[in-house]
Amino acid sequence: MNAIVALCHFCELHGPRTLFCTEVLHAPLPQGAGSGDGAGRGEPADEEEGGIQMSSRIRAHSPAEGASAESSSPGPKKSDMCEGCRSLAAGHPGYISHDKETSIKYVSHQHPNHPQLFSIVRQACVRSLSCEVCPGREGPIFFGDEQHGFVFSHTFFIKDSLARGFQRWYSIIAIMMDRIYLINSWPFLLGKIRGIIDELQGKALKVFEAEQFGCPQRAQRMNTAFTPFLHQRNGNAARSLTSLTNDDSLWACLHTSFAWLLKACGSRLTEKLLEGAPTEDTLVQMEQLAELEEESESWDNSEAEEEEKGPALPEGAEGRELTKCPAESSLLSDCGAWQPRKLSVFKSLRHMRQVLGAPSFRTLAWHVLMGNQVIWKSRDSDLVHSAFEVLRTMLPVGCVRVIPYSSQYEEAYRCNFLGLSPHVQIPPHVLASEFAVVVEVHTATRSSLHAVGCESEQPLSKYEFVVTSGSPVAADRVGPTILNKMEAALTNQNLSVDVVDQCLVCLKEEWMNKVKVLFKFTKVDSRPKEDTQKLLSILGASEEDNVKLLKFWMTGLSKTYKSHLMSTVRSPTALEPRN
């Protein structure tokens, strides 16, 4: 966790003071700087760019350098400190714990070495023991801002038989620049810091009771003459926390507790990528997968029933059946016939546009978006398959019905992408229909091959593509809005293929949202045509091509979404009259 945890004390002589703090070091220390739980030395590094971080970076130095660094330390001078303001003895190097899992080091000093961090901790210390106090002056509170960091502070009292009111005022603070993270960590920090405080108070209470039992001070205090000036009691008003708790290893224990607190709090909350609700494509794919699983289960059950009902085979029949198996269906023949995929394939929509030409590609894309049947005739089945793989990215998953390669024509209601071999005859009414487009792939002539260039460099140059349709309106009309935006992205050479793909995904999501609104408006609510026209104008889809596109894409909505809408409409709350 990128934070600082500090123990603060309100001294009767010097006011709020920072006693002990633990910070996180993300940079590895050189050899000799200490490893594990041990002592180490540090000096402030150069200020990091990009704002203040809740950690600093240190490097090892010699004792002579440590002395010079101590003289230039941002902390208070020795003359301004008493026993109650000081935690580590003069020349104490501090504590370092090394987390081998994350290569992070937790370093504890009395003050942060970085001047800006010292200022932040100092200000938080003063505010936690002066103005930012919860009712009762003992308990947790949250304060801070973007400039000086956000602070979780828990104030508490420690028993002292020589102090005013027999107690001294302390606080444990956790400083972080991330407000949301600190607020979310409130319950965890409150419980763990409260445990540290209870342990300190328990040790101090035992010392207090022992001192009171050995030498009661209450009568002496009550008889002391009043004076408006601060003065020491029994010559030692400023007692260190180690003497109050009678624990010489107190600071080492606090270092361990603070280091564990920083590590545990950082490991407790982790960032996760929230993808939101599943898209329509995801829902449709899940439904298709479920249907395939149901079909496979039904086939397995039917085969099991046939085996149970069938007569017992004579001895040796299984061997004869295996020998009758045709060579085409054997696994060995399939593996032997496997070859690497050919290079004569389309790689992307931009590649297809370059090969077909802008006018032919626009005609083809228009028919794809409108839901018309797209027929490819070629001897190369891999080429047809790659063309369909590229073209299907323009449509939602639910609108795609593909027959990759067939030896006979299939009707449009069965597929909107159909691959045929060259000898297959297409019915005349389909060729003349405005709801179909045919792409015929021919072998290029010798002259065109030399004109285009080397066949090995451009494998698709050995083909000629002829795009025909019974309706030439695709090239004449303005076309659907999504087609115009798509062509603008494809023609922009500053956009890479990956960026164009993401742009296409965003365009499909935008128009699928419009499809959902139109479906809810027309199919579920059954609004009149006048209201539907107003809605289309608001959606920016009042043109004829846009309306056709929305109606076709409506068929690609998932069954889950449709059933959810219908169940919502039929619920009692939905049947209440509208105000």
Swiss-Prot record:
Record text on activity regulation: GTPase-activating activity is inhibited in the folliculin complex (LFC), which stabilizes the GDP-bound state of RagA/RRAGA (or RagB/RRAGB), because Arg-164 is located far from the RagC/RRAGC or RagD/RRAGD nucleotide pocket. Disassembly of the LFC complex upon amino acid restimulation liberates the GTPase-activating activity.
Family affiliation: Belongs to the folliculin family.
Keyword Amino-acid biosynthesis on entry: no
Domain cDENN FLCN/SMCR8-type: 339-491
The uDENN FLCN/SMCR8-type domain, residue ranges: 86-242
dDENN FLCN/SMCR8-type domain boundaries: 493-558
Segments of skewed composition (Low complexity): 63-76
Major location category of this protein: membrane
Domain of life (superkingdom): Eukaryota
Sections of the chain in a coiled coil: 285-309
PTM text: Phosphorylation by ULK1 modulates the interaction with GABARAP and is required to regulate autophagy.
Subunit structure, as described in the record: Interacts (via C-terminus) with FNIP1 or FNIP2 (via C-terminus). Component of the lysosomal folliculin complex (LFC), composed of FLCN, FNIP1 (or FNIP2), RagA/RRAGA or RagB/RRAGB GDP-bound, RagC/RRAGC or RagD/RRAGD GTP-bound, and Ragulator. Interaction with FNIP1 or FNIP2 mediates indirect interaction with the PRKAA1, PRKAB1 and PRKAG1 subunits of 5'-AMP-activated protein kinase (AMPK). Interacts with HSP90AA1 in the presence of FNIP1. Interacts with HSP70, STUB1, CDC37, AHSA1, CCT2, STIP1, PTGES3 and PPP5C.
Cellular component per GO, a single term: centrosome
Region (Disordered): 32-82, 294-321
Keyword match Nucleus: yes
UniProt-listed InterPro entries: FLCN/SMCR8_DENN, FLCN_DENN_C_sf, Folliculin, Folliculin/SMCR8_longin, Folliculin_DENN
Function: Multi-functional protein, involved in both the cellular response to amino acid availability and in the regulation of glycolysis. GTPase-activating protein that plays a key role in the cellular response to amino acid availability through regulation of the non-canonical mTORC1 signaling cascade controlling the MiT/TFE factors TFEB and TFE3. Activates mTORC1 by acting as a GTPase-activating protein: specifically stimulates GTP hydrolysis by RagC/RRAGC or RagD/RRAGD, promoting the conversion to the GDP-bound state of RagC/RRAGC or RagD/RRAGD, and thereby activating the kinase activity of mTORC1.
Cell compartments where the protein resides: Lysosome membrane; Cytoplasm, Cytosol; Cell projection, Cilium; Cytoplasm, Cytoskeleton, Microtubule organizing center, Centrosome
Protein name according to UniProt: Folliculin
Gene Ontology terms: biological process: cell proliferation involved in kidney development; cell-cell junction assembly; cellular response to amino acid starvation; cellular response to starvation; energy homeostasis; epithelial cell proliferation; ERK1 and ERK2 cascade; hemopoiesis
